[in-house]
Amino acid sequence: FEGIESLKAQIVDVMDDMKMEASHGNVIVMGSENFGRKGLAIDIVKAIQTMDSTFSGKVAKISGEALNKKNIPMTLQKLRNGALIVENAGGLTPITVNAITESLQNEVDYILVVFEGEKETLEPLLNGCVETKSVFDARIVIDDFSNSDLVAYAKGYARELEYSIDDMGTLALYNKIGDMQTIDHVVTVDEVIEIVDNA
């Protein structure tokens, strides 16, 4: 997310706030799936694996709907000293969210839980329980990217590959993204990566 300053600032804040202590420092990644939400959730877990020496357990991914059917305390105990990524966490029921919150506050010492999902489905769940907000206090909101954001992302991605995009390339990139962007189609980060890879 090189070049998208508002998102980079949120990521830096989350890196400071997230902790393996179960009762706080858990992460929420909200936004459209088209803009790298799942990849960012995975990258956050990879980052804490390298940063925190208490991280020694397993990493698991599960959908919100599937987690509703699990025994929450037992599931979290199995992942102690590890991480759980809940994909499409908006599919969680309020009962499951409360069970996760209670388990993180009382039953598990060290774990990182990452909720990722659409803002429209996650916010109502989080607003329903004050304790959940204090347990999941590291938050990233990925807003829809403008063409300028996508161009900045492309330039950052190119830099990671040790390439640069000159002024003519930047103009061509704006034109390409503008042509692809329609009322029915939102250009995704993956499409921007493909443009750079094909250049």
Tell me what each language-model feature is:
Residues 1-26:
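Pre-Walker A (pre-P-loop) alpha-helix and adjacent loop at the N terminus of AAA/AAA+ ATPase modules
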Residues 15-19, 66-106:
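Conserved alpha-helical scaffold flanking the Walker A/P-loop in AAA+ ATPase domains
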Residues 24-57, 136:
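Walker A/P-loop
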Residues 34-35, 66-68, 90-92, 118-123, ...:
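Conserved nucleotide-binding/hydrolysis micro-motifs of P-loop NTPases
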Residues 47-79:
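AAA+/P-loop NTPase substrate/partner-engagement loops
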Residues 85-87, 110-120:
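Structural recognition of the conserved hydrophobic beta-strand(s) that form the central parallel beta-sheet
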Residues 109-110, 127-148:
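A short helix-turn-beta junction within AAA+ P-loop NTPase domains corresponding to the substrate/partner-engaging
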Residues 144-146, 150-199:
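Conserved AAA+ ATPase small/helical "lid" subdomain
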